[in-house]
Amino acid sequence: MIEASKLRAGMTFEAEGKLIRVLEASHHKPGKGNTIMRMKLRDVRTGSTFDTTYRPDEKFEQAIIETVPAQYLYKMDDTAYFMNTETYDQYEIPVANVEQELLYILENSDVKIQFYGTEVIGVQVPTTVELTVTETQPSIKGATVTGSGKPATLETGLVVNVPDFIEVGQKLIINTAEGTYVSRA
């Protein structure tokens, strides 16, 4: 059992028969009354997100999530296909369940498949990935890093804010946790 006050982003727990992943968690102390935990959560099975509050002392059953190394093969219609790199088993995951993760991976990328028991519940991408810029505004001569930046579309369709000196065709390092530009590759 884990208390609501100990829940952090990325953790998974069970509540009311649902498997829930914490997207955001914060303590909130209203002017009067006791502290509450405000959370943004995702139902792992349905993919729906919702906001809720819990008392800090409420307890939940922490879900045991196992991961296996896998490779992203391809996407067809509404299904993404992955292969376990140890056993060569293939997994089909609805695109709706991994839509955010697909913005960070290309075909043949290494990932980790997450299991709850025997049920595939998601994909874990590396903390940083290397992607190529496919579309952005032209560079401005003399641009520096201190500027406000400009939007750039990457090869997966992800749009990130980048410094003004970035050009089409350059490879960038992207932080997958925040969806932000880190550096040129």
UniProtKB/Swiss-Prot annotation:
InterPro entries noted in UniProt: Elong-fact-P_C, NA-bd_OB-fold, Rib_uL2_dom2, Transl_elong_fac_P/YeiP, Transl_elong_KOW-like, Transl_elong_P/YeiP_cen, Transl_elong_P/YeiP_CS, Transl_elongation_fac_P
Primary residence: cytoplasm
Subcellular location: Cytoplasm
HAMAP family per UniProt: EF_P (MF_00141)
Gene3D superfamilies for this protein: 2.30.30.30, Nucleic acid-binding proteins
Gene: efp
Annotated family: Belongs to the elongation factor P family.
Function: Involved in peptide bond synthesis. Stimulates efficient translation and peptide-bond synthesis on native or reconstituted 70S ribosomes in vitro. Probably functions indirectly by altering the affinity of the ribosome for aminoacyl-tRNA, thus increasing their reactivity as acceptors for peptidyl transferase.
Organism lineage: Bacteria, Bacillati, Bacillota, Bacilli, Lactobacillales
The protein's name in its UniProt record: Elongation factor P
Keywords for this protein: Cytoplasm, Elongation factor, Protein biosynthesis
